[in-house]
UniProtKB/Swiss-Prot annotation:
Its main location: plastid. It is an enzyme of class 2 (transferase). DNA-dependent RNA polymerase catalyzes the transcription of DNA into RNA using the four ribonucleoside triphosphates as substrates. This is DNA-directed RNA polymerase subunit beta. Transmembrane segments: none annotated. In plastids the minimal PEP RNA polymerase catalytic core is composed of four subunits: alpha, beta, beta', and beta''. When a (nuclear-encoded) sigma factor is associated with the core the holoenzyme is formed, which can initiate transcription (Potential). GO terms for cellular component: apicoplast; DNA-directed RNA polymerase complex; mitochondrion. GO terms for molecular function: DNA binding; DNA-directed RNA polymerase activity; ribonucleoside binding. Belongs to the RNA polymerase beta chain family. One of its GO terms (biological process) is DNA-templated transcription. It comes from the Eukaryota.
Length: 1051
């Protein structure tokens, strides 16, 4: 009987994170407070003795919403934890009860995120090594040394190392070593007990180890024995001579499964003898061991475990400040200890990526394996065979954290205690039978994992030969009806990689880049479904939390653009509110539309809404473009992209973004106050035409660069040194002179758009309702500006295969080369990026997309087309299909017998047939969020770093433009040599040319010289010199003898 991975609704179970968080608050928090908080406190205050008693069992919670002034997008829900305290006067026996506010925590919902300052934050999972016993080896003096690592529940560990070359076995704790036989002697185990319970009692090796320990004088010296006992007590923090180690709580099911003969309860003294036998088994190669990095030995950390671990640290600090928190005279609270730094500064709690619904889903799928010790360990970064079906083999971060931050596979579930589960369904004679649940990966080792779509031969007799994986090894076996797991090709990856149609024909590094680019794509206004699909476009929407799904079956009573009203089977009315023009964390717009109508019957988990990147319940974030691989006037240099104006006119890559402006009106006293008015000095009526009577921009107005958003004037009395001058001015003009300061808010360059909403909040400053504000503000204004970004030169376009480039030129349609059927291409891409990056998949997508474009159909290619039949079957299938349809009427341009898959094109300007042929097809392209308007800013002179002499980063620091590799290629394609020279030399780290240009512009007393060598190139020369390599440059002179002169480098 075989088993196949089962697809089910909930993949990564957010319910485990949600329930574990509240289980910690209800159950574990009380136990934690009892262990750390003392039950009684004594206070002395002005001749009064007070006794404070903590009532742990009366601990309660209260959920409140933060004031609306702090809610930018959503309502912030807080959980307040109160600890009741009992105050008793020891003299008068007077009793008071007060509730002490310990912590304020954000409320986590069932989708595993919370709200902080109105913005979504998510907890990134992290997996740790479970407590237990792990065996490993290392090479020392060309000899394998085996050791056992015991990891305890209190994060302490020690090693038992067997070194037969030195004829001893010793215990290593915190870089200190002493004999393991002597350690057993301290525990009360005699040598006769070791020989009695050990399986090697008749071997010479064990007797030799015992004899080497007895040779030392440590056994007979009582002072050394007492010293070692005290040292062991300080480390383990328990009575060493106990026969049962209650602190050594280790999961025995894994140990008994792997090695057997362990006791059922906690670690006993006899188990140390069994560990000694296992080390001798490994030395004699009678037993194989699992490494500590095996996925069996890991568990996922949930949000409840995270708070439980950090509460211990903060509770201990909280005890020390309790006397300062409570005034015994008034019995009131002074302040609450700040616990929010745990939520703001911790790298595991991040702002949710909301570029599109796909990026939000994949952000929840991240898994962190980073700690302070894993940065230089290469074993943690490698792909282990036990990760098949559980962790994605490709998806990871780039840079120094490569391999440390990975992603879950598509069909996994987090079970209790952080165990990863994969669900399977049994298959017998190609029919699905009963449902089977593998609780742990230990059970998976009882079955053979088959890659059923990988055939090794074309001969029919050998078609049943399968590649099988079992117990960390690959084998080749004949197919049988024994228990086996049929692992599909798509089950090895996450959803990001499964959106790439022909992933098998690409380089894995480019597939990773293509997956990252899809999660960074911006939702478009005029988007279309892709012609070539994988079948996972609809499945992503069912897994995503960005859409609204029906909680109960029922009938729609009312469906509008604001809410959906449904009556369920129990005659209950459920209202779903839609998100309308809300800003995401990455400044994109979240806008939901209803999918149901009045009177429709809906079922559980049915989609009720769609948003900005969904078409007909399917993920669609790009457009299908007709393109060809070639060149056009050199504008396609390297990865630069050329686009026709038809794409710009039809707004195929136009997107919406939103900015939020917040500002306060402050006051110091009655005479020094900020206010808004239409009568601002030195401004014309043309500038103030979009303002209302209060001096605030009107809703729906179009604002450009330099427009006024809000007028803000501060009036204060001027200060005079001589009062006589003040009286003279008052007698002449009849009015007092006021000092008016204009603090109006103007739109910066690149921030133009349309005002969508304005919010005004009046802060109540009365004595009854005090609200603590910054800078004594009495009024808060919030303006929402919606921006429409068109496709401009400098934006990034990308495909699904990691093929991305900077838009370098927007050409006229009539100037571009056209095909035989008078079709003009939408985009032109350089052809050199395919063979150098081994992206054969995008060639297949171009040909298949051309077929689907011609017949107006959508094609779902199988991942296992060539594997089930023979190699090159997919290429032959596509060519035969093109040739077959070539004979139909109107499709004779699809296939050229002389040039299969290619087309002959003509110049659009002259109509002359070009010599070379090009590969033309239809592929899906999308626009990345790295827009040129956000990156480009003006910078004449600015600060530089002292050591590297590079411009500082960021607009706030007046830093340089972030010109990368592809931006330089776009400038080179356009032939902008002077701009390129200015960016790479004068605005970069060429110190000599920079100083020469400054003196030339300021003083005009020096000539403008050529640019010299940059500082970064000088660093490379120094590194070459460190490798005993010398780099010299030569110039050819104009002499008739053609002598070479050495060019000196100033470094």
């Amino acid at each position: 009987m075989n088993f196949k991975i089962k697809t089910f609704f909930s993949i990564k179970s957010n319910k485990i994170f949600y329930t574990d968080f509240y289980f910690f608050l209800k159950k574990k928090l009380i136990i934690l407070i009892k262990n750390i908080f003392p039950e009684y406190f004594n206070f002395n205050n002005k001749y009064k003795n007070w006794n404070l008693i903590c009532l742990y069992d009366l601990l309660y919670f209260k959920v409140n919403n933060i004031n609306f002034l702090d809610n930018v997008q959503y309502i912030n829900s807080l959980i307040k934890i109160f600890l009741p305290l009992k105050f008793q006067n020891l003299k008068t026996n007077k009793v008071f009860f007060k509730n002490l506010l310990i912590f304020e925590l954000p409320k986590y919902n069932s989708y595993n995120y919370c709200y902080l300052n109105g913005l979504k934050k998510i907890f990134i999972s992290k997996y740790f090594t479970s407590n237990g016993i792990f065996f490993n080896k290392y090479l020392k003096r060309k000899y394998n040394i085996y050791y056992a690592k015991l990891l305890l529940t209190n994060s302490n560990f020690f090693n038992i190392i067997l070194d037969l070359k030195l004829k001893q076995i010793y215990l290593s704790i915190k870089n200190l070593k002493f004999n393991f036989i002597l350690f057993l002697y301290y525990l009360g185990i005699k040598n006769t007990d070791i020989l009695k319970y050990s399986r090697y009692k008749n071997s010479k090796i064990l007797k030799l180890l015992i004899f080497s320990a007895l040779q030392t004088d440590l056994v007979n010296n009582k002072k050394i024995i007492l010293k070692n006992l005290n040292y062991l007590k300080s480390i383990f923090k328990l009575t060493i001579l106990n026969k049962n180690y209650k602190n050594f709580i280790i999961s025995k099911d894994k140990l008994n499964y792997n090695y057997g003969d362990f006791s059922k309860n906690n670690l006993l003294i006899i188990d140390f003898i069994f560990i000694l036998d296992l080390l001798l088994d490994l030395q004699s190669k009678k037993l194989c061991f699992k490494t500590i990095d095996h996925l069996d030995n890991k568990h996922i950390n949930t949000i409840g475990n995270y708070f439980q671990h950090n509460f211990k640290f903060y509770l201990k600090k909280f005890i020390s400040i309790i006397p300062n928190l409570i005034k015994l005279q008034k019995f009131s609270l002074l302040k609450v200890y700040n616990f929010k730094e745990l939520l703001i500064l911790n790298p595991l709690i991040q702002y949710l990526e909301q570029i599109n619904s796909f990026s939000e889903l994949m952000h929840k799928y991240k898994l962190n394996n980073y700690n302070s010790f894993s940065k230089g360990i290469l074993n943690l970064r490698e792909i282990c065979l036990n990760q098949l079906g559980k962790l994605c083999l490709i998806d990871t971060t780039e840079g120094i954290n490569c391999g440390l931050v990975v992603s879950f596979a598509k069909h996994i579930r987090i079970y209790k205690k952080g165990i990863i589960q994969v669900y399977f369904s049994s298959i017998f004679k190609n029919k699905t039978k009963e449902f089977l649940n593998f609780k742990t990966s230990l059970d998976q080792e009882l079955y053979l994992i088959q890659f059923n779509n990988i055939n090794l031969r074309k001969i029919k007799y050998l078609m049943n030969v399968r590649l099988v994986y079992n117990k960390n090894n690959f084998r080749i076996k004949f197919f049988s009806n024994k228990k086996s797991i049929l692992l599909e090709f798509t089950d090895l990856f996450s959803f990001t990689e499964n959106l790439i149609p022909f992933i098998k024909y690409n380089d894995p590094a480019r597939c990773l880049m293509g997956a990252k680019m899809q999660s960074q794509s911006v939702p478009l206004l005029n988007k279309k479904k892709s012609f070539v699909i994988t079948g996972y476009e609809k499945e992503i929407i069912t897994k995503s939390d960005t859409t609204i799904k029906a909680l109960q079956e029922g009938i729609v009573l009312n469906a509008s653009s604001l809410k959906i009203h449904i009556k369920d089977l129990f005659n209950r009315e459920i209202v779903y509110y839609l998100s309308k023009y809300k800003k995401s964390n990455q400044n994109t717009i979240i806008h939901q539309k209803p999918l149901v109508w009045n009177g429709e019957r809906v079922f559980t988990n049915q989609l009720l809404t769609q948003h900005q990147d969904i078409i007909d319940s399917e993920f669609a974030i790009g457009n299908n473009l007709l393109f060809y691989y070639g060149n056009f006037c050199g504008y396609d240099f390297e990865d630069a992209v050329i686009v026709s104006k038809r794409v710009l006119y039809q707004q195929l890559f136009s997107s919406l973004h939103m900015d939020i402006y917040e500002f306060n009106f402050c006051y110091n006293n009655e005479n020094d106050i900020e206010f808004s008015t239409l009568e601002i000095p030195k401004q014309s009526y043309y500038i103030k035409k979009n303002l209302d009577s209060l001096g605030i921009i009107k809703e729906g107005e179009k604002i450009l660069t330099g427009s006024i958003l809000l007028t803000k004037i501060k009036v204060a009395k001027p200060t005079y040194t001589y009062k006589s001058i003040f009286k003279l001015i008052y007698s002449i003009f009849g009015k007092t002179i006021r000092n008016i300061k204009d603090n109006s808010l103007y739109i910066q360059t690149g921030k133009s758009g349309r005002v969508s909403k304005i919010e005004l909040f009046l802060v109540n400053i009365s004595s009854r309702h005090k609200y603590k504000t910054y800078n004594n503000s009495y009024l808060k204004c919030r303006i929402f500006i919606c921006k429409q970004r068109f496709l401009t030169v400098g934006d990034k376009l990308c495909g699904r295969y990691g093929n991305k480039g900077i838009l370098s030129y927007i050409a006229e349609n009539a100037d571009l080369p056209f095909l035989q059927n008078s079709f003009y291409p939408d985009i032109i891409v350089g052809a050199l990026g395919i063979p150098s990056r081994m992206n054969l998949g995008q060639l297949f997508e171009a040909l298949v997309g051309k077929i689907s474009f011609s017949y107006n159909i959508r094609i779902l290619p199988s991942f296992t087309t060539s594997s089930n039949l023979y190699f090159n079957y997919l290429k032959i299938l596509i060519y035969n299909f093109l040739m077959f349809n070539n004979f139909k009427k109107g499709f004779n341009w699809l296939y050229n017998f002389n040039l299969p898959g290619k087309f002959i094109i003509r110049d659009g300007r002259t109509g002359v047939k070009l010599k070379s042929s090009v590969l033309c097809g239809v592929s899906r392209y999308s626009k990345l969020i790295h827009l040129i308007k956000d990156k480009l800013h003006f910078r004449t002179t600015g600060p530089y770093t002292e050591i590297l002499q590079q411009p500082l980063k960021g607009k706030k620091n007046l830093g340089g433009q972030r010109f990368g590799e592809m931006e330089i290629w776009a400038l080179e394609a356009f032939g902008a040599s002077y701009n390129l020279k200015e960016i790479l030399n004068y605005k970069s780290d060429d110190c000599f040319a920079r100083n020469n240009l400054k003196e030339y512009l300021l003083f005009r007393n020096t000539e403008l010289q050529n640019s010299t060598i940059t500082e970064s190139f000088r660093v490379i020369l120094k590194e070459f010199n460190g490798l005993i390599l010398n780099l010299e440059l030569f110039l050819i002179t104009d002499d008739l003898e053609e002598n070479y002169l050495n060019l000196t480098i100033n470094y």
